[in-house]
């Protein structure tokens, strides 16, 4: 039987699929007619049939893409090891001492110079194992001696497990911020305190009138005011007056106290919802009594006039005008020496004319 006939038989006969093995290889069994010797070429043909099975449309579950490592493990029959993580990097040296060449706190990386090989090793802030407890950020100081492990990185040697000499915490950079000594206090709004409740008296001795009086007393109780700050107290500021001091001031302005009394009662009956308005009285000059009137009056030219009416006190003397000029006051003279002058004018003249009285 030639190779061509064997391939035709392989495609025509139903192929039995075998589940994949642990190595991911699929085996196909092809029936061979009895009485015919199996040749080496037939084995190859069987292999060819296995290869042509998927192409002919046989439903085979082909494994995923193979890697070079998987091909080697398929031949050996052992599972492939998982991919190596970043933490399992090969360690080149452990507990190596070095001096920090420079470290940037803002960017979080720098370089350490090894003391044994004088080689610069990259260090990141995440590689610092024991940081200064007083520092807020992880860092190492410039020129500081540190102890670290050297591992293989993507671009070269890299430091890991960075501590101080002997495993102590590192000092840190002087540019790294320090931690706050105390926790920041955040004030929280407190709920308003409920009004003080009046203690309930025993039910046996209560009276209906006493409860109403207690309710009025609780409503009239003044609220406590917080004192002003120290710098505000030193100023002489006139604050609002209590209601008991405003009552006499309002009565002095001409308002009767009878009208103000019911208003204050209404305000007290309310729950002090609206504070009393501030009232500042207008300044008024105090009353000064005027001096008594002079018995004589003066004319426009400063001369005296005798009284036209009787002086027995039955009729009051005329008052002097209010719009009198100021300079006339200086010409005013006492009435004592003027009486003989008036008598001389009223004396009879030696001439034969009858006596006359000078009147203006």
From Swiss-Prot:
The keyword Nucleotide-binding does not apply. Phosphorylated during oocyte maturation and dephosphorylated following egg activation. Phosphorylated in vitro by a kinase activity associated with testicular mRNPs. Dephosphorylation leads to a decrease in its affinity to bind RNA in vitro. One of its GO terms (biological process) is negative regulation of translation. Residues 95-165 form the CSD domain. InterPro entries: Cold_shock_domain, CSD, CSD_CS, CSP_DNA-bd, NA-bd_OB-fold. Residues 219-360 are annotated as: Required for mRNA-binding. The modification Phosphothreonine is found at residues 67, 78. One of its GO terms (molecular function) is mRNA binding. Found in a mRNP complex with PABPC1 and YBX3. Found in a mRNP complex with ZAR1 and ZAR1L. This is Y-box-binding protein 2. It comes from Mus musculus.
């Amino acid at each position: 039987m030639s190779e061509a006939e064997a391939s035709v038989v392989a495609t025509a006969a139903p192929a039995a699929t075998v589940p994949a093995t642990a190595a991911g290889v699929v085996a196909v069994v092809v029936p061979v007619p009895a009485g015919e010797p199996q040749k080496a070429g037939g084995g190859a043909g069987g292999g060819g049939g296995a290869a042509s099975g998927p192409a002919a449309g046989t439903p085979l579950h082909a494994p995923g893409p193979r890697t070079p490592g998987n091909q080697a493990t398929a031949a050996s029959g052992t599972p492939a090891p998982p991919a190596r993580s970043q933490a399992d990097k090969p360690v080149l040296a452990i507990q190596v001492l070095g001096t920090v060449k420079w470290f940037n706190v803002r960017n979080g990386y720098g370089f350490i110079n090894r003391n044994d090989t004088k080689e610069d090793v990259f260090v990141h802030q995440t590689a610092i194992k024991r940081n200064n407890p007083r520092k807020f950020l992880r860092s190492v100081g410039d020129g500081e001696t540190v102890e670290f492990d050297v591992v293989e990185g993507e671009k070269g040697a890299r430091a890991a497990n960075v501590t101080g000499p002997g495993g102590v915490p590192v000092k840190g950079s002087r540019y790294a911020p320090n931690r706050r000594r105390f926790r920041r206090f955040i004030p929280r709004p407190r709920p308003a305190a409920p009004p003080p409740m009046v203690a309930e008296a025993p039910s046996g001795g209560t009276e209906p009138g006493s409860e109403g009086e207690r309710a009025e007393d609780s409503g009239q109780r003044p609220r406590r005011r917080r004192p002003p700050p120290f710098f505000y107290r030193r100023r002489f500021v006139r604050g609002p007056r209590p209601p008991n001091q405003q009552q006499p001031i309002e009565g002095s302005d001409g308002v009767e106290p009878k009208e103000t009394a019911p208003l204050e009662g209404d305000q007290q009956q309310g729950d002090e919802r609206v504070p009393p308005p501030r009232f500042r009285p207008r300044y008024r000059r105090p009353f000064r009594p005027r001096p008594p009137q002079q018995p004589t009056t003066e004319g426009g030219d400063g001369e005296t006039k005798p009284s036209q009416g009787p002086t027995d006190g039955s009729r009051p003397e005329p008052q002097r005008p209010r719009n009198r000029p100021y300079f006339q006051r200086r010409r005013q003279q006492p009435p004592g020496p003027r009486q003989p002058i008036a008598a001389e004018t009223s004396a009879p003249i030696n001439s034969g004319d009858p006596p006359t009285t000078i009147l203006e």
